[in-house]
Amino acid sequence: MVSALYAVLSALLLMKFSFDVVRLRMQYRVAYGDGGFSELQSAIRIHGNAVEYIPIAIVLMLFMEMNGAETWMVHICGIVLLAGRLMHYYGFHHRLFRWRRSGMSATWCALLLMVLANLWYMPWELVFSLR
């Protein structure tokens, strides 16, 4: 399953973001909240934003693949999703709004493509079956 590749890569990305938060919490000795440190605030939001988008994207990608979408379509969506998350990280981390905006746009494009692919490949005869 191709979607497993993107689930694994996304999980690694989430782990990296999580480690960044933990490292900064230890550095600034902050157990709860952000302690008013902007670097920690950014790391928390980078991680939080990824947690908000990646899980639903992976579920959509898995359903898309299970519904019979072409393998190349799954790869395109996975690449756009990961590129978007990396651009968002880079833009947020370096305070470059253009990169952050581009990353969110790529993430939304990937989500929209997966929604449309799922609607297209949905086994509608089973969805509306009374059996």
Swiss-Prot record:
The segments annotated as topological domain Periplasmic are 129-131
List UniProt keywords, sorted A-Z. Answer: Cell inner membrane, Cell membrane, Membrane, Transmembrane, Transmembrane helix
Q: Which GO terms describe its cellular component?
A: membrane; plasma membrane
Chief localisation class: membrane
SUPFAM superfamilies in the cross-refs = MAPEG domain-like (SSF161084)
Positions the record marks as coiled coil are none
Query: What's the protein's topology in the membrane?
Result: Single-pass membrane protein
Localization in the cell: Cell inner membrane
Question: Is Lipid biosynthesis one of the keywords UniProt gives this record?
Answer: no
User: Where do transmembrane segments lie in this chain?
Assistant: 108-128
Q: Which domain of life is it from?
A: Bacteria
A Pfam family assignment: MAPEG
Cytoplasmic side, ranges: 1-107
PANTHER family referenced in this protein's UniProt entry, alphabetically: GLUTATHIONE S-TRANSFERASE-RELATED (PTHR35814:SF1), PTHR35814
What is this protein identified as?
Inner membrane protein YecN
The encoding gene: yecN
